[in-house]
Every structure is written in C-alpha cells, then in structure tokens.
Amino acid sequence: AGVDQSAGGPGEDGRPQRRQFGNLFLSREPIEYCRHHLLPKSASIGPLSIQRSALECAVTFSGTRFRFVNTHLTHLCSETRVPQAQELLRIHKEAPHEGLPVCGAIEVNPLRDGGDYWAEGLMTGEVSPNAVMLGDFNCTPDTSEYELITGPLSPYGGRVTHPLGFVDAWVYAGGDPDGGFTSDVKNEPARLDYAFVSAGLRECIARCWVDEAAPGSDHQPVWLELA
C-alpha cells in the first residue's frame, strides 16, 4: 500500500480503523517476486494529496519472465504527475542493473540461523528488460506525462519512441487515438487508463480493448492480450 495509516481509534466493531490505498496484482501463474516503489509526492494545503506507488511483479509465461508494473498516478495535475512518470521510467530502465530483490552469494551462520534457510527458494535468473506498465495514469494522451512515456509526436508521422521506452498498447493494436475512453474529466469522456508495453515487446501485442460494460468502478477496465 502507498498509504497505510492509522485513522484514529477502533470502529464500532472494535477493530482498528485504517486509511489504506495502493495497488493490487492478481495472477493465475505464480508471482516470482514483487517490489514496491513509492512515487514522488507533492505536499498540498489545498486539494487532497495522497502517497502514490507502483507495484512491480514478475511472472513467467511459456518459459519467458515478464515484469508487470501496476500503478495509479496522482489526480492533482500534470505538474505533479510528471515526476511520477519520470520515476516509473527510471525504475524500468534500472531494473536489470538492480537485479532480483534477493541475489548473490548467501552467507549464513548455521549455529545462529539453524541452516541455510535463505537459500531455500532462492531467486535465480535475470530481471527482464521488458515490462508491461498498466493502471490509472489520470492523464489524457495530450499531456506531458503521456509524452514522456511514449515519446513525442513527430511532424513526419508517429511518435519518436525510445527503444527503452513504451508504446501505448491501445494505439499500437489499432485503436482510435482519440477514442478508447475509460472515464471522464469534468463530465467529458476521457482516456485515463492504459497498458503501456515496453518497445521490445511491442510485436507481442495481439489485442487491446476497453470493457465498456464492466460495472465495478468509475473507470472502465483495459484488457491486453499478448501473443
């Protein structure tokens, strides 16, 4: 959770009250590791400012390890989201260099630790340079934070996407860049939720669509199929 704070005394049922806010990742396949990243936050004496975070998880499909980064950027304004987008890109680019959450040689004291318990289920392999970054980014495609992630538009056509950057799966799969609405801004339809796929995985994008009938949220879910 990006926010996990006491909300005062116990509730009517006697249980502690808490303010909690964060991201959830569910997988049919085993989650091999996860990392929790806090994103830059701005203090505010006006609109409510909440600590935002990103949850990075690794899952192997058909022998290939994928990284998924699930996030929810601030609703405040573009100026407060840009540092968060920059941090997401830093996390992505440095992930292979930082390696697995637990890696390297294991040193234990058998008398104190009772054996080589850290070595049980020790993570192996390398961190994938490719990732899928998805969630509620609270921004439309004409904003600076979107451009940071996908690259600037060129007058010669298309976006100048860096090989270490991301493509917008909705657009890459043939979706209308001006459509795919998932929510609204001031009662105007808007696309705020995305599945960004690292450039190295772009050819794996098979389909991307918005479930317009789902009733579970004030935002509509975005589905992505990789093949």
Residue ranges and their predicted role:
Residues G2-A227:
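Active-site regions of metal-assisted phosphoester/phosphodiester hydrolases
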